[in-house]
Each structure stands twice: as structure tokens, then as C-alpha cells.
């Protein structure tokens, strides 16, 4: 079954808040992105329950450690039943390859996606930590590393989507945060794009948070966004 194009960022701090939000979302039409905040608060059992209820889950924990540890971490994620799991490309080829190999034991492994440059980071932020490349140059460099390591795709900003599809091919998956409908505030994301423009640019899976989670009616907000991209 094809994965949903939209993953709702569940940036909640409690199970009650998460349950309330998920109850307003259509399983099968949107997926759930579970990040460090929620996963640390309520753990894998809650995530597994959402999978059992029909939701596709993107486990956004951005693993970055020694190869053996990351391999075990993605294995644990796959056992929960998530559809997408990610690692930091800056962990290097050996780490990414170890994660890829660890997932070969599963009949239906999750997509293994690499994080390139966080969408909150500007060129000056990269320069501050010793990276002289622009954000776009660094994204491409890390994306190529991820592809060479056998990963399924990368997390990137929508602005880099056309470049990555052109250089790495259409089968290399792009997962993109910083998606905001035209009438939404940009928040703390510095590189944003509308859902329609993101799809046109080649984005495969969009992560959308506040425009849905802080909407007066999350159900209606989801329906409006799905309509805007022809879903």
C-alpha cells in the first residue's frame, strides 16, 4: 500500500494531547510523525498502538551514533511497525550502511531516510559550526552519501527538492518539513513552501505540524490540504 503524502507532526508533550489530536485525523489519509518530544514522553507502546489502528508512522528520532548502536536502533523501530525511520547523514557512510543492513531481515522494512541539513539552519549557522558550504551544497553532498550507502531517501527542505530529484533520480525519496499552506505563519522554519508547490517540486512525503495541530478544526485543515494537492 502506498504511504500517505502527508505526515502530521505530533509535537505533543502528553499522551492525552496526542490521543486528542490523533482522534481528529483520518487514518490511511495522513500519517503520524513522532519525534523526540513525544516518543520520550510516552514511548514505543503508544506508537505501536497507532500502527495497529491503521496509521502510517514516521519515527523521527534522527539516530546519530556509532554504527552498531544505530543498527540496533533502526531494528527496534522496524519491530514497532513504523513505515519511515531516519538517521543523520553526517554520521557517515559506515553508520548509514550498518542501518541499511540491519533492516534487510524484515519482509517489509521501513524506508530508511537520512537527515541532511536541519531546515532551521541557515548558511551562517553552518559556517558557525565549521561547514563552509552553503546549506544547498551541504544538502547535496550528504544526500549523495546517503544514496551511495543504499538509503531510500533524505529529509530536505522543499527548496532543494528539484535539485535532488535531478541529481539523484526520481526514485530517491524526499521527505520535507517546513510545509506551510499559503495562509500560515512560517514559525521557526527558515526554508518553507506550500503543499502544492512542494508536490510540484518533487517532494514525496510532507511533514506538516502547526497548520494542522494548532488549527481550530484539525480535521477540516487536513481535508483542505489534501484537496489542495489533489488527494
From Swiss-Prot:
Pfam families: OMPdecase. The active site is at 62 (proton donor). Substrate binds at residues 11, 33, 60-69, 119, 180, 189, 209-210. Keywords: Decarboxylase, Lyase, Pyrimidine biosynthesis. It is an enzyme of class 4 (lyase). CDD domains: OMP_decarboxylase_like. One of its GO terms (molecular function) is orotidine-5'-phosphate decarboxylase activity. One of its GO terms (biological process) is 'de novo' UMP biosynthetic process. Pathway: Pyrimidine metabolism; UMP biosynthesis via de novo pathway; UMP from orotate: step 2/2. Its EC number is 4.1.1.23. GO terms for cellular component: cytosol. It catalyses: orotidine 5'-phosphate + H(+) = UMP + CO2. Belongs to the OMP decarboxylase family. Type 1 subfamily. HAMAP family: OMPdecase_type1_B. Homodimer. Catalyzes the decarboxylation of orotidine 5'-monophosphate (OMP) to uridine 5'-monophosphate (UMP). This is Orotidine 5'-phosphate decarboxylase. The gene is pyrF.
Amino acid at each position: 500500500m502506498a504511504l500517505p503524502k502527508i505526515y502530521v507532526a505530533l509535537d505533543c508533550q502528553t499522551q492525552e494531547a496526542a490521543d486528542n489530536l490523533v482522534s481528529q485525523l483520518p487514518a490511511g489519509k495522513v500519517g503520524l510523525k513522532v519525534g523526540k518530544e513525544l516518543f520520550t514522553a510516552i514511548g514505543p507502546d503508544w506508537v505501536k498502538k497507532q500502527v495497529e489502528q491503521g496509521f502510517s508512522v514516521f519515527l523521527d528520532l534522527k539516530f546519530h551514533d556509532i554504527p552498531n548502536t544505530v543498527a540496533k536502533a533502526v531494528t527496534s523501530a522496524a519491530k514497532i511497525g513504523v513505515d519511515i525511520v531516519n538517521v543523520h547523514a553526517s554520521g557517515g557512510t559506515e553508520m548509514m550502511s550498518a542501518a541499511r543492513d540491519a533492516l534487510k531481515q524484515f519482509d517489509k522494512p521501513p524506508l530508511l531516510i537520512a537527515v541532511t541539513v536541519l531546515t532551521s539552519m541557515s548558511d551562517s549557522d553552518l559556517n558557525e559550526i565549521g561547514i563552509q558550504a552553503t546549506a544547498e551544497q551541504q544538502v547535496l553532498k550528504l544526500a549523495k552519501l546517503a544514496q551511495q550507502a543504499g538509503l531510500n531517501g533524505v529529509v530536505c527542505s522543499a527548496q532543494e527538492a528539484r535539485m535532488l530529484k535531478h541529481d539523484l533520480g526520481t526514485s530517491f525519496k524526499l521527505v520535507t518539513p517546513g510545509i506551510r499552506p499559503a495562509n500560515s505563519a512560517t514559525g521557526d522554519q527558515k526554508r518553507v513552501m506550500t503543499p502544492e508547490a512542494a508536490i510540484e517540486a518533487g517532494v514525496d512525503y510532507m511533514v506538516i505540524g502547526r497548520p494542522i495541530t494548532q488549527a481550530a478544526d484539525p480535521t477540516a485543515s487536513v481535508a483542505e490540504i489534501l484537496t489542495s494537492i489533489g488527494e
